[in-house]
Structure formats: structure tokens, C-alpha cells
Regions:
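Buried hydrophobic residues that stabilize the cores of well-folded domains
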Residues: 1-266
């Protein structure tokens, strides 16, 4: 997810080390070939392409289906304070579909977002509200006729970490958005997540463990429709900058996901 307010950079979010200009991720079903060797099967999983400016902010992104087919391309622009000011969405063929323009107050807090279609007609305006600590606590979307079309409420712990997203009004037309609950470690990384369906029932639960670099190394997941928790472990092959080139996910010592990344550095 894009962090709207300035501060930090998108390298830290992934996380990657060094001055990365571009990272491309592909994912496959893993196939065991003997005790140690693992092959790539069919394309399946998380695919993306990110391009960064020299300051580590994301300037371009490509989003894909689970089968590795490009869905859309996005460009990000920033104001002189480093805040995200414009987000432009394109089809894979390069046709503009949506523009999002972000506005901030003098404290640098995101206050509103105007969503325009490819012809430049405004479709929706989102408004954000904050608590006394400066945490974003409410996000409300309005259509051009003033009708409320979506509403989210955000809850924080005493460290200002978002521990719950509540869906008060489901956005129309999009895939159903459920509520999310989260817990954090001392480094501020998410160690627990629970996704709830729109009716409030638990859909899936996840726990995460990280190494000192902030990379996810193991965890548990209880997928939708299952009662048993599954433990998984990642094994890495790194490049000379310390970023992983290959990451293999194991469940019960059996490889299940094979992911690879390509990096371009400044």
C-alpha cells in the first residue's frame, strides 16, 4: 500500500537494500526435484514491477493477476514536500482510466482525494479526518451529487499503529472489502492479521516473523474455509546487495511457492 503522507520511502516498505531503481517479482508453483532442488511450475502468486526515484519513492508500478497477466499500470507524482500528489492509472495498453489527485493541509496530512475518470470528469471525492494525535480515523467517499458511497473507520494503538480497519459502508462495484485487524512487533512490523468478511465473520488469520533485515522468514496462515493453522518457512538466495533473488516457501518441508526477483540499481 502507498503511504500517502511523506516521510520514509518505499524501499523500506518492501523492504529492499541499496539504491534500487526497479524490482520485478514473478511467482510460480514450486515443484520438488529431489532433496534440495526445486523447479518452477506454472505461474501463480504475487507479481509486480516497481520503479523508484533516487530518493526511494515509487514512481511507477505494474499490477498483475495471480497468473502473471498485467492488469494495470500506475504512475505516481509527488509535491515539493514529498507527498503523493497524483496517481494515474492506465490499462496495460496505456489508456488512462483513472486519475487520483491528493490534497494536504499545512501539517502535511492527507485531507482529500479527487477521483477522475479518463476524460477528466470527477467521479468521487474522498475526505479524511484525524484524531488529536494526528492519526487518520475516518475515510468517507462522496459521489458528485453528494451521496455518501463508502466509509472506513480506522482504530490505532497507543503507538499510533493501525490495529483495525472497519468498513461502515461498502464501496459499490468493487470486490467486497472486509474489515482487518492487526498486531505489531517492537519494530512496527505487522505480526498478526485477521481478515473479516463483510458480515463480520473471520475469513483468514495470519502471523508473521521477520529477520533483522525486516524480511518475512516464517509464519502461520489459516486460509478461508479451513479450521487448521498451517506453518510455513521461507528460504532465500540473495544477490550481492543482500536482496533476495529467489524465495521458496515451504510447508511441512515441502516447497509450495517459488518466487524470483530481478533488480536494477542506480
Amino acid at each position: 500500500d502507498i503511504e500517502y503522507a511523506g516521510g520514509g520511502n518505499d524501499w523500506e516498505e518492501i523492504p529492499v537494500r541499496g539504491k534500487v531503481k526497479k524490482v520485478q517479482q514473478r511467482s510460480y508453483v514450486a515443484i520438488a526435484k529431489g532433496p534440495q532442488a526445486v523447479d518452477k511450475g506454472e505461474k501463480k502468486g504475487q507479481f509486480f514491477v516497481y520503479e523508484f526515484g533516487e530518493n526511494g519513492r515509487k514512481v511507477k508500478e505494474e499490477r498483475f493477476t495471480e497468473a502473471g497477466v498485467c492488469r494495470e499500470k500506475i504512475q505516481y507524482e509527488y509535491d515539493e514536500n514529498g507527498n503523493l500528489s497524483k496517481e494515474s492509472h492506465y490499462t496495460p495498453a496505456g489508456v488512462l482510466t483513472v486519475n487520483k489527485n491528493y490534497g494536504y493541509d499545512k501539517e502535511g496530512r492527507l485531507k482529500h482525494c479527487s477521483i477522475l475518470d479518463g476524460k477528466g470528469e470527477i467521479m468521487q471525492r474522498d475526505v479524511y479526518r484525524y484524531d488529536i494525535e494526528g492519526n487518520m480515523v475516518q475515510e468517507v467517499g462522496y459521489l458528485t451529487n453528494g451521496t455518501k458511497c463508502s466509509e472506513f473507520r480506522y482504530i490505532y494503538d497507543s503507538y499510533g499503529q493501525q490495529i483495525e480497519r472497519k468498513v461502515l459502508l461498502q464501496p459499490e462495484g468493487s470486490d467486497p472489502v472486509g474489515s482487518v485487524r492487526r498486531g505489531y512487533n517492537f519494530q512496527g512490523r505487522v505480526v498478526f492479521e485477521e481478515y473479516l468478511s463483510p458480515d463480520g465473520t473471520s475469513q483468514s488469520q495470519h502471523t508473521y516473523r521477520y529477520n533483522i533485515k525486516g524480511e518475512l522468514v516464517s509464519g502461520t496462515e489459516r486460509p478461508e474455509g479451513q479450521t487448521e493453522e498451517v506453518k510455513y518457512v521461507y528460504k532465500f538466495h540473495n544477490d550481492n546487495q543482500g536482496n533476495w533473488k529467489i524465495r521458496i516457501k515451504y510447508i511441512d518441508d515441502v516447497p509450495v511457492v517459488y518466487e524470483e526477483r530481478e533488480y536494477t540499481y542506480y
